[in-house]
Curated annotation (Swiss-Prot):
Subunit field text: Monomer.
Name of the protein in question: Enoyl-[acyl-carrier-protein] reductase [NADH]
Superkingdom of this protein's organism: Bacteria
Positions that bind substrate: Y225
Catalytic function, reaction form: a 2,3-saturated acyl-[ACP] + NAD(+) = a (2E)-enoyl-[ACP] + NADH + H(+)
Pathway field: Lipid metabolism; fatty acid biosynthesis
Organism of this sequence: Streptomyces avermitilis (strain ATCC 31267 / DSM 46492 / JCM 5070 / NBRC 14893 / NCIMB 12804 / NRRL 8165 / MA-4680)
Active site: Y235
Purpose: Involved in the final reduction of the elongation cycle of fatty acid synthesis (FAS II). Catalyzes the reduction of a carbon-carbon double bond in an enoyl moiety that is covalently linked to an acyl carrier protein (ACP).
Segments forming a coiled coil: none
Keywords for the protein's UniProt record, in alphabetical order: Fatty acid biosynthesis, Fatty acid metabolism, Lipid biosynthesis, Lipid metabolism, NAD, Oxidoreductase
Amino acid sequence: MKPTGRGYLLLDAHPVGCFRSVELMRAEVPVPEKPPARRPTALVIGSSSGYGLASTIAGLVRYGIDGVGIGLERPAGHRSATAGWYRTVATDAIARELGADFSFRNADAFADTTKTETLDLLAERFGGVDYLIYSVAAPRRTDPRSGTTYQSVLKPLGAPHTTRNLEFADDGAAQVREVTVAPATEAEAAATVGVMGGEDWSRWITALAERGLLRSGFRTVALTYIGSPLTSAIYRGGTIGAAKAHLESTARALTERLAAVDGRAFTSVNGALVTQALTAIPGIPLYVSLLRGVLGDRFPSPVAQSLDLWHQLTARRPDVDDSGRIRLDRWELSEPVQAAVAERWRSITPETVTALADTAWFRAQCRALYGFDVPGVDYTVPVATDLPWPES
C-alpha cells in the first residue's frame, strides 16, 4: 500500500503503520509502580485521534481507567478504513492486555441515540463516571432536537486575512504560498459555534446527571487552544476562536451545575500539535513547522501533554489560570519561543523555508496520521485492511 491523495489529505490508511503509531505512543507512558486502589471510570469522546487518542492511551497505561471511548470512523470498503478505525483496534488491544474494562463505540457523539446507548452501557457496567474528556473535531454537526445541520468554517472575523501557508509539491518539496481568506458572515460564525462550541458537551453532562451517573468529585474537560499572535486572526480571533470562547464559557456554567456532586468542569488550553483538522487552517502548518524548527526535540508530543492533562485532572488543586483554564501551552507561548518563531516568520521565503522551519518533520507527522512514514514499519509487505471494530 502506498500513500495516495492530494495536499495533506490521504485517501487510505496503513493498518500496520497505525498500529505502530499507537505502540510508540504507549511507549511514552511511564507504567505506575502499583495499580490504582480503584480503577476510575472515564468517558472519552473523540478517542480515535489527536488528544483524545493520546488521553485514552495515557489513561489506560498510567491511570488504570475503565470506561468507554467514542469515535466516528469509516470501515474498509473500496478503500481502507480510516486511520482512526485502525488506531482504535490497536488501543483496544492495549486495554485488553492491561485487563481494563474499556469499550469502544463507533458512533456520532452528537446524536441523542449515541448518548442514550452509551449511558445505558455505563450504567450497566460501571454505575457511574469519574471523568469525561471531550475532544471532538468535526466539520459539521446535526442538532438531533432541531434537525438543523451546522457547518463550520475556518475564517477570520470582520476583515479579510492574508497569511502564508506551507504546502508540499507531489515530490515532497516544501512551498510557501500567500493566501487571503475572506471574513465569515454572522451566520457562518454562529454555525461554527454550533459545531465546535460547548452545546454538545453540556448535553452530555446533562444526560449523565439526569441518569444519576456523576460520581462525587466528577471532573470533565474539553480541549481548547489559544495559539500565537501570528495565527490569532485566523484562529483565536476568527470563527474557531469564537467557538472556543463558547466552550470556555460553557465550562464555567457547568462548574456551577456540578457543585451538587463536588465536581468541576475545565477547558484545557493545550499546545500545538499536528492533526488532520490543523492542516486545513491557513497559516497554521507553517507556524507549527517554524515552532518545531525553534524547539526541535523539545516540542512536546500529544502523549506528553495528555499525561500533564491527567495529572491536572486528578490533582486535588489543578493548576489553572485566572479564567479557570488548565494551561498546558506555556511551553509554546513563552516569550523567548514566540520571539524566535516571529523572527523566523518575518524572515521566511520560499528559498529559506526548509532552513527555518522543520518541514520534513511536519510532512512526516502528517503522513503518520494515516499510518505512513512511521518508523519500524516495512511498507513493502502486503497488509489486510478489512479489520473488525473491537467488540464491546
